[in-house]
Amino acid sequence: RDTGRLHGGMLEWGYYEDKEPRLVDAKDIGNPDKTMTSPSMRHLTLEEISEPLEKAFETTPILNELGWDERSSFNGLLSVTSDAGSLIGESPEVRGFWLCEAVWVKDGPGCARLCAEWMVNGKAPMDMHSFDIARFYPAQKEKAFVKTRSFENAQTIYTPAVHPREPYLTQRELFVSPFYTREKELGGYFDNEVGGWERAFAYESNRQKLNQYLEIVPTRNNEWDQRHVPYEIANAEHLAMSESAGMINLSHFAIMDVRGPDAERMLEYLSVAKVGGNTP
């Protein structure tokens, strides 16, 4: 990228490493032997960026004249998480310890305000699930999981464009249901996992049901809109169940015990329905 800002007779230039991102372990962030004037600025050599710099010379010829200044060049540290989202909110492990991390410059003011309002008012003005630091399950906090998923996300920050349902390649099959083998035999589409659980979005064996509902199943004309989830089969499955019966695997859904004197009231508020019944 070309920021277009001159500094000391030089022109700032930078790029994002999408092939082999250099991961930094948390314990090494402040290592004075590996950092420059800031923990986020790490030493950089010309050899490390020779290929992208050559492309920069082609697109911005003036860089050839300005040359390379090793003294002001650095490898910038970016915070990339295992699901590419920010980490905002109170730590699940340490009460009263609030974080607003993995936030980049363009999102800084908004995220800081959300965090501040959350701290002061006890709740955020919007749904914070995709930012909430408490969103991770124990298995997703393991070092190997964080490292491999973060590396995978770092390779696709800007290049190439990533489909919203693009499946992760690493840390798969952490948890599978008792029916997993049978589901695969039925042609289960396990492109994506949910909370570490392999979960089929539809089954190829049910494609035949499409013949009954061809006139009412929506058609997705764009290839981009058809990737990773066989929507037409899933729609046929739903319609078939509405007319008859079916079996649904719920083993990969979250199951929670809600206890306390206000448990019933809270659950009915959340679900907008009467759910208590005779439950003590």
What are these regions (language model features)?
Residues 137-280:
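Glycine/proline-enriched, intrinsically flexible loops and inter-domain linkers
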